[in-house]
Swiss-Prot record:
It is found in: Mitochondrion. Component of the mitochondrial ribosome large subunit (39S) which comprises a 16S rRNA and about 50 distinct proteins. The gene is MRPL11. Keywords: Mitochondrion, Ribonucleoprotein, Ribosomal protein, Transit peptide. One of its GO terms (biological process) is translation. This is Large ribosomal subunit protein uL11m. Belongs to the universal ribosomal protein uL11 family. It comes from the Eukaryota. Pfam families: Ribosomal_L11, Ribosomal_L11_N. It comes from Bos taurus (Bovine).
Length: 192
């Protein structure tokens, strides 16, 4: 490599523009990893981004995961586009669970009714992914049912409070047994 080509390579500025897609929790943007290094590579002021994001999401319940697009311009300014919460967040909230099933298809982590799915579909149908493609509501509902299945959430037609209470009691016992088995496996692994 000649001296001239090395000098030109050194003078070239790194590409500063582009789109960063991420999921950030409302009101909890911080300059640390993983967001800080990504924005820093593009020359964006991390503190300014965090202030602006937290200001835009101050009316939303803190901690809700929001799909976010960050458009970085050539002059290293940025524009933030915040989407609605993810389908998995809505499904887990409707089912009253924190995590999905470990073994989807074999265990059921929660129950939701078709009414819940329909309400989630009405909200998500306004999302860019569905609205730009003019997707019918029935397709959005099928997509959400597929997401529920992948989380281990069973979609039922009707659900009485007694059935829900019985399921939650059974699920709590299952999770306690699973936790005990995990602790026993960890203790066994520590002995080896």
């Amino acid at each position: 490599m000649s001296k001239l080509s090395r000098a030109t390579r050194a003078l070239r500025k790194p590409e500063a523009e582009g789109v960063i897609r991420t999921i950030l929790r409302a009101g909890q943007a911080m300059p640390g990893p993983p967001l800080g290094p990504i924005l820093g590579q593009r020359g964006v002021s991390i503190n300014q981004f965090c202030k602006e994001f937290n200001e835009k999401t101050k009316d939303i319940k803190e901690g809700i995961p929001l799909p976010t697009k960050i458009f970085v311009k050539p002059d290293r300014t940025f524009e933030i586009k915040i989407g609605q919460p993810t389908v998995s967040y809505f499904l887990k909230a409707a089912a009253g669970i924190e995590k999905g099933a470990r073994n989807t298809g074999k265990e059921v982590a929660g129950l939701v009714t078709l009414k819940h799915v329909y309400e989630i579909a009405r909200v998500k149908a306004q999302d860019d992914a569905f609205a730009l493609q003019d997707v019918p509501l029935s397709s959005v509902v099928r997509s959400i049912i597929g997401s529920a299945r992948s989380l281990g959430i069973r979609v039922v037609k009707d659900l009485s409070s007694e059935e829900l209470a019985a399921f939650q009691k059974e699920r709590a016992l299952f999770l306690a047994a699973q936790k005990e088995a995990d602790l026993a496996a960890q203790a066994e692994a520590a002995k080896k």
